Amino acid sequence: NITFDTGSSAIQGGFTSVLDSVVMVAKEFDKTLMQINGYTDSTGSFQTNQSLSEQRAGSVARYFMNQGIPASRIRSTGYGPRDPIADNSTASGRSQNRRVEIEMLPMQQ
């Protein structure tokens, strides 16, 4: 998972090496589709969180496109505060929930 600062869709510098590793795998397995799912913690309104989750997924998608992955292989979706992986009542939990998950799936023929 790639995590984000509160209210931000900017990719933190420490995650570029992780994303670059994903790019290498995606280039090697060029018959895959990259599904990028963005999430937020539960702080703030649902509408704001939904938009922010879409922006986070979009930031990662743009990073991949800038590294040479064709847009036709990338799908991004924002889920807002749905599907938390940690407790939103703690700072640590909220930090874990502000994330993007990347799935590599076989392309449909």
Regions found by a protein language model. Name each.
Residues 1-3:
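Acidic/histidine-rich, surface-exposed loop or edge segments in extracytoplasmic proteins
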Residues 9-16, 27-29, 37-109:
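Periplasmic OmpA-like peptidoglycan-binding domain that tethers envelope proteins to the cell wall
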